[in-house]
Amino acid sequence: GSSFVREDKTVENGKRSKYPCNWELQGFGEYTYGRWYTIKGERPSDETGIYRYKFESPATTSGERIKIFFDGVMTDTEVFINGKPAGEMHQGGFYRFSYDITDLLKPGKKNLLEVKIAKESANKSINAAERKADWWLYGGIYRPVWLEVVPAVHMRHFILNADQHGKLQAAIEMEGDAKGYELSVSVRSLKDGKDIYTQENKSSISHQIKDSNKEQLVEGNWMNIQPWSTEDPICT
């Protein structure tokens, strides 16, 4: 577990806390129902807490990077490694975010992770979307946190858009100097794992990266697609 402390307490007085778990379930803070705004004079609870956890950094080879991923934190989140900020504050409780912490780590030594969380967002639009709702409001790290070792050049983010006729578009953002690298996209059957061929009778399509700072768009058309549907579900 990690240690946890409310902002109005000293870190030395922190208590052991399990995660992933919203902090109300462990006796910190209080629940407020999401329709608090319908009650005159009512305000939602807005605690701030700090998680502290010591860990050893994973081994890496030359050029590899270490990233820390948060699958879900409610709500505004600041991350510090050995007392230094990992990046800008993340706002929004329902989606994953990450930081490259390679240069902040002490290889072979204990490293300190501190996560400062404000239950209520400083962003009004986020509060309107996430906190004015028909559910209980909560705070804390409620989804898993993990480290990943990645190559110096890797995919940072991608979006796939496939239609029932076999057309596929892949929008890919790269991390690192990827100029001259080649991206390859292939499609396999869920039933037997075999390659599905394009209309040009190729098992994959390739894309040469000319500018790694730009989004890479890869497009292709595949034959004999059997799209999943409720009428014709494909079980794996």
Protein language model features and the residues they cover:
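Beta-strand-rich binding/interaction modules
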Residues: 81, 167-203, 207
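Short, solvent-exposed loop/linker segments at the N-terminal edge
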Residues: 160-166
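Short, intrinsically disordered, charge-balanced linker/junction segments flanking boundaries
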Residues: 2-4, 198-199, 232-236
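Accessory beta-strand-rich segments of carbohydrate-active enzymes
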Residues: 1, 22, 41-42, 46-157, ...
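Intrinsically disordered, low-complexity Pro/Gly/Ser/Thr-rich segments with frequent PxxP/GP/PP motifs
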Residues: 200-224
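Predominantly extracellular/luminal regions of secreted and cell-surface proteins
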Residues: 1-28
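Short, surface-exposed beta-strand/beta-hairpin micro-motifs centered on an aromatic residue
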Residues: 94-98, 215, 226-227
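Short glycine/proline/serine/threonine-rich loop/turn segments at secondary-structure transition edges
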Residues: 61-64, 105-110, 217-235
